[in-house]
A protein has these predicted regions:
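Alpha-helix capping/helix-boundary segments
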Residues: 46-48, 95, 124, 174, ...
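Glycine/small-residue-rich loop that forms an oxyanion/phosphate-binding "nest" at active or ligand-binding sites
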Residues: 67, 74-123
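Class I SAM-dependent methyltransferase SAM-binding "motif I" and its flanking Rossmann-like core
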Residues: 104-162
């Protein structure tokens, strides 16, 4: 299967979004790039080959790994390839750089004046915000919270008076603990949503307040998880926040 009616791929670096889970969300431009890019820099080479197979297309270019632990070392090699051809950057799901590899390559491209463009598409952050049912006109995305309880609680404390909606990813193994800490620090009655397995067969959007969601998550929340917490208000500030500090 070939994708017709599209312009030839440009020289340089292409950042392309891949489906979160439903291959039907793959854009025509992504499919075209997978077929014709000279080099595909993939977070997981097996995943991108499986995606191409699911889409019924063949990859003609070279596929190399480009993940968190090797992307800085890989950047120069990819920039050299992009100087005379097309390098397609994809991650396991969603948009490169958004809590995923890609930044080192884009920074190196800017230094070498190599063109960079984007083939937009699926992303968990706006998808979760749209499905949350919360007031999310302004939001703060903070990737993954710290893994250890101490730094995680300090992170939540720093968000106590954040008026924008807060969106972050979390491991299913830690989400119950994180939600319980958020309920304790931000307020158990703070509206929130847990978005699980977005666009996949078992997609689930669980809405409620932080206290309710923390209790629900104790039984186990599987899959890839995005959490959205509604922003606070001036009325939500704690008494301690309102006590004038001594000069």
């Amino acid at each position: 299967m070939s994708v017709l009616g599209l312009d030839p791929l440009p020289r340089g670096v292409i950042l392309a979004a891949t489906p979160l889970g439903n291959v039907g969300d793959a854009s025509a431009r992504l499919m075209h790039a997978l077929q014709h890019a000279d080099v595909i820099a993939a977070e997981d080479t097996r995943r991108v080959r499986n995606l191409a197979q699911a889409l019924g297309i063949e990859i003609s270019g070279r596929v190399v790994s480009n993940f968190d632990h090797n992307e800085k070392d890989r950047a120069q090699q990819l920039i050299d390839a992009a100087a005379s051809g097309t390098v397609l950057v994809v991650t396991d799901a969603g948009m490169p750089i958004i809590s995923d590899p890609g930044l080192s390559l884009v920074s190196a491209a800017a230094e070498r004046d190599i063109p960079v463009t984007c083939f937009p598409g699926p992303s968990a952050v706006p998808t979760a915000l749209a499905l949350s049912g919360l007031g999310v006109g302004h939001f703060l995305f903070d990737a993954f919270p710290p893994r250890k309880p101490g730094p995680r609680k300090a992170w939540l404390e720093s968000l106590r008076n954040e008026k924008r909606a807060i969106v972050f990813f979390e491991s299913p193994h830690r989400v119950a603990e994180t939600l319980a800490e958020a309920a304790d620090i931000l307020g158990a009655d703070r509206p929130a949503a847990v978005c699980r397995e977005l666009t996949k067969t078992y997609e689930e959007i669980r809405r409620g307040n932080l206290g309710e969601l923390a209790e629900w998550a104790v039984d186990g929340a599987r899959g890839e998880i995005t959490v959205v917490i509604e922003g606070g208000t001036a009325a939500a500030a704690t008494a301690a926040d309102l006590v004038p500090k001594a000069l």
